[in-house]
Amino acid sequence: MKSSVFILSLFLLLERQAAVVGQYGGTKGHFQSSSSGFMLGQKGHLNFGLKGGSEEAAEESIFMQSQHQMFGQDGGDMAQTSVSQEHTGVKGAAICRKGQVSQLKSQESQIKSFRQVKSSGQLKSGGSQLKSFGQVKSSESQLKSFGQVKASGSQLKSFGQVKASGSQLKSYGQMKSSGSQVKSFGQMKSSGSQVKSFGQMKASESQIKSFGQRKSQGGQLQSYGQMKSYGQTKSLESQAKSFGQVKSQSGQMKSSYGQRKSYGEETQLKSFDQDAQLKSYGQQKSQKQSSFSQVKSQSAQLKSFGQQKSLKGFSQQTQQKGFAMDEDLSQVRKQFDDDDLSVQQKSTQQMKTEEDLSQFGQQRQFGQERSQSYKGYLAQYRKKLQEQQQQKNFNQDNFFTKGGAGLYQAQLKG
């Protein structure tokens, strides 16, 4: 009887230990605790709640009552052995339970670190995505602005080319007008030099004529001097002859009174001849001078006529050249007016393009402000969406209510 009771109590004790081992993480796959309130499922998720503490206490009390009754019926010796065995089993169960609690705590810390790593990885990926999206947006805006700047640069280049062509046309017109002026000045200068050379030729001709006249006058004067010296020599000879005659006939003065009278008559006749010769020479001289003055006046008239003729021809040439210059100037003026009109049209077109560019810049600034406000709204929306996604990932198996999940998250963050 004692042996059967001992075997029965030993069997019950082994069954109790097996049940305790199954309860603390053996075959049933979950662990119950009245103090901690944690429960670890087979999937690896943490389940929280107050569960099973009173049931375990009731089972222990029922088992203890049955043991005490059995030990009371069978004998006092077996009661002491069963109580000691039960005490050792409870100690082992407590040790096993402590080990399971430590394992549970380590698993909970691992899960916390895994969740933190996962959330930080999601935050990093979301930040990198936002950064890449911002970079793409900035690159798009840069490309747009670069295209606009390139278009405005090409427009400015074309405007500069138009302006340069206008300035070149203006400078070409100025060069043409200056060239025509230089040509006309050169023609006038050449005509002036021709007139000067013609005047010099005329002056040289007049000088040659005056030199010839002077030479002829010198020859005439020389001949007049020769004639005068010949008359003087003649008179001297006659005087010498008369002196010799007077000297030879001085002794015969009284006897030759008639001879003296004849000598006086001869001298008077000689002096009269000399006076007549001098008068004829003065008449010849006056005639020559009058003819010289007539020739001089005729040459002066011819000279003035030639000058008038040359001046008339020169005036006709200058008139013809002036007409040609007026025609060239009218053509240049017409071309300059056309160029000025084209430059005015291009300047109005440029002002219009500048106004269009300013309006486009204002529209672009308004678009940039709108895009910045949209970026801020997009960042807020993404932040809110990320928070919602984190909450959803945390409570994806719906183990918690909405308030419980938020409370546990706040506790984890704290």
From Swiss-Prot:
One of its GO terms (molecular function) is zinc ion binding. The repeating unit appears to be involved in the formation of the copulatory plug via a transglutaminase reaction cross-linking glutamine and lysine residues. InterPro entries: Seminal_vesicle_protein_repeat, SVP_II_CS. The keyword Signal applies. It comes from the Eukaryota. Residues 1-22 form the signal peptide. PROSITE patterns: SVP_II. Keywords: Copulatory plug, Pyrrolidone carboxylic acid, Repeat, Signal. Residues 108-311 are annotated as: 13 X 13 AA tandem repeats. This is Seminal vesicle secretory protein 2. The gene is Svs2.
